[in-house]
């Protein structure tokens, strides 16, 4: 059933196949950012471009040709704001600029560590006396929660499975590389979604003895906002006093981030989801003991794992990826690129008959 549904979803996506931005593209953008801010990195309005209208930047920005020098405000928080800008006049190389009064140094350091493992690419950091500026990848789909809320009627089961699989696999990779890493705030607002043209090309995800073959359906998840994050080599004084009520600590359970993400995903699906989200909700109910779902139980507080509770019954990554939810990626499915119809050969024009 799941495999057939997965194949039907792939067929529906075939018309949108295109070319996605690659790691080499991000590397090139990063080099241009560093070159641009070399002399006046504290004044992004003088070195970047933005679209010359009032529209919100999205996927169409790559086709925009009317631009002007400056940036566009796209978000604000307690300590600062986020702006959109481009390093090229054609606005094909877009970036985000986070400006705030509090230091962004730790967030930049952790961002650099995690960007190869499903984190948002960070390009540069500037300490500018009364403000701190971080230049990073621009993500056009917004937060995971907003993405689901605004597209609830168009998302298919394959999209939810893609989101779940990408996040869990990247957390698995992060903890293999940096076992001490804790994001500590991985809810649906701190995961961003990049929307691009699907390529339907496949990528292998290896978790122990499990190998998943995952198609590119035009959605890429990105971890962001490392304001409460830590590693054994990067301390974070802002987490002091958050251990009892929020379970946030360098000594929190290794699956702290995984649990918070799955619990948050369940809450978002309950609030905004439709029939397409039911399979994902059932997966979360199946994989996590009931005392890990919700806001407060003897195992969790404020939707998060309690620091001093016994979490030995929480599933490992191997157990999670062994669940039937991932069968469509474990089964041998017909090459997804073959769903793209072949172009019909052009018949040669008949030769004119002699008069």
Question: For each of these PLM feature ranges, what is it?
Answer:
Residues 13, 234, 238-239, 245-344:
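Helical subdomain adjoining the active site within ATP-dependent kinase catalytic cores
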Residues 120-157:
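Conserved structural core of kinase catalytic domains
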Residues 41-42, 46-89:
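ATP-binding glycine-rich phosphate-binding loop
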Residues 72, 76-113:
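ATP-binding glycine-rich loop module of kinase domains
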Residues 168-176:
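Short C-lobe core helix of eukaryotic-like protein kinase catalytic domains
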Residues 188-252:
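Catalytic activation segment of kinase domains across protein kinase-like and atypical kinase folds
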Residues 176-189, 193-194:
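Catalytic-loop of the protein kinase fold
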């Amino acid at each position: 059933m799941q495999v057939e549904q997965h194949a039907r979803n792939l067929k529906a996506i075939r018309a949108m196949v295109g070319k996605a931005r690659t790691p080499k593209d991000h590397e090139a953008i990063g080099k241009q950012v560093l070159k641009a801010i070399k002399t006046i990195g504290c004044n992004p309005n003088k070195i970047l471009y933005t679209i010359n209208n009032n529209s919100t930047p999205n996927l169409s920005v790559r086709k925009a040709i009317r631009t002007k020098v400056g940036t566009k405000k796209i978000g604000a928080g307690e300590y600062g704001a986020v702006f959109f800008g481009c390093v090229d006049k054609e606005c094909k190389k877009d970036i985000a600029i986070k400006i705030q009064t509090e230091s962004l140094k730790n967030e930049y350091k952790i961002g650099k560590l995690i960007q190869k493992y499903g984190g948002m690419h960070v390009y540069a950091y500037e300490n500018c006396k009364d403000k701190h500026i971080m230049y990073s990848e621009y993500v056009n789909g917004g937060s995971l929660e907003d993405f689901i809320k605004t597209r609830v009627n168009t998302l298919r089961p394959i999209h939810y499975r893609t989101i779940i699989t990408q996040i869990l696999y990247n957390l698995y990779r992060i903890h293999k590389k940096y076992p001490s890493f804790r994001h500590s705030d991985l809810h649906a607002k701190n995961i961003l979604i990049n929307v691009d043209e699907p390529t339907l090309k496949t990528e292998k995800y290896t978790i122990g003895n499990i190998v998943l073959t995952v198609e590119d359906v035009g959605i890429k998840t990105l971890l962001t906002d490392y304001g409460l994050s830590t590693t054994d080599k990067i301390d974070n004084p802002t987490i002091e006093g958050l251990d009892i009520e929020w379970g946030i600590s360098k000594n929190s359970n290794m699956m702290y981030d995984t649990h918070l993400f799955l619990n948050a995903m369940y809450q978002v699906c309950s609030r905004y989801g439709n029939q397409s989200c039911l399979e994902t909700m059932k997966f979360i109910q199946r994989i996590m003991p009931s005392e890990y779902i919700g806001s407060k139980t003897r195992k969790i507080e404020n939707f998060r794992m309690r620091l001093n509770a016994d979490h030995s019954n929480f599933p490992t990554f191997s157990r999670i990826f062994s669940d039937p939810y991932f069968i469509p990626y474990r089964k041998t499915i017909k090459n997804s690129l073959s769903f793209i119809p072949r172009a019909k050969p052009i018949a040669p024009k008949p030769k004119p008959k002699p008069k």
